[in-house]
């Protein structure tokens, strides 16, 4: 959830921009802070989840995870409307998606012996998470 903390800081910095335009020095400090926050987040991608299309900023590491890839494959079967090729839509309830993110964050993929078992469960988990 550290991503959301960074986004909150960036959002508050952007909100302060108009009020600081009178003081050029403060504006420059705020602008440089916002730019540094954005550069830290360059590895993030927007993913829209659920029927409400709630946006999430996910790292490439999460998007490359086999479970997330399976979820995307299954979601493409349910979602017919694609406005452009860069839009990533996931057919999953928001609450379940947040649980999935929590699982991915807290899982340890250092277990070499469990790879076969994990591959088999990826399909089952993706089936559970999609509508």
From Swiss-Prot:
Organism: Arabidopsis thaliana
Keyword Transmembrane: no
InterPro entries given in the database record: SAUR_fam
A Pfam family it matches: Auxin_inducible
Function in brief: May be involved in the regulation of ethylene receptor signaling. Promotes cell expansion and plant growth.
One BP term from GO: ethylene-activated signaling pathway
Keywords linked to the UniProt accession: Developmental protein, Ethylene signaling pathway, Growth regulation
Protein family according to the UniProt entry: Belongs to the ARG7 family.
Biological classification of the source: Eukaryota, Viridiplantae, Streptophyta, Embryophyta, Tracheophyta
Protein name per Swiss-Prot or TrEMBL: Auxin-responsive protein SAUR77
PANTHER family named among the record's database cross-references: EXPRESSED PROTEIN, SMALL AUXIN-UP RNA-RELATED
Keyword Transmembrane helix listed: no
Highest taxon in the source lineage: Eukaryota
Misc note: Plants silencing SAUR77 exhibit increased sensitivity to ethylene, while plants over-expressing SAUR77 display reduced ethylene sensitivity. Plants over-expressing SAUR77 exhibit increased rosette diameters.
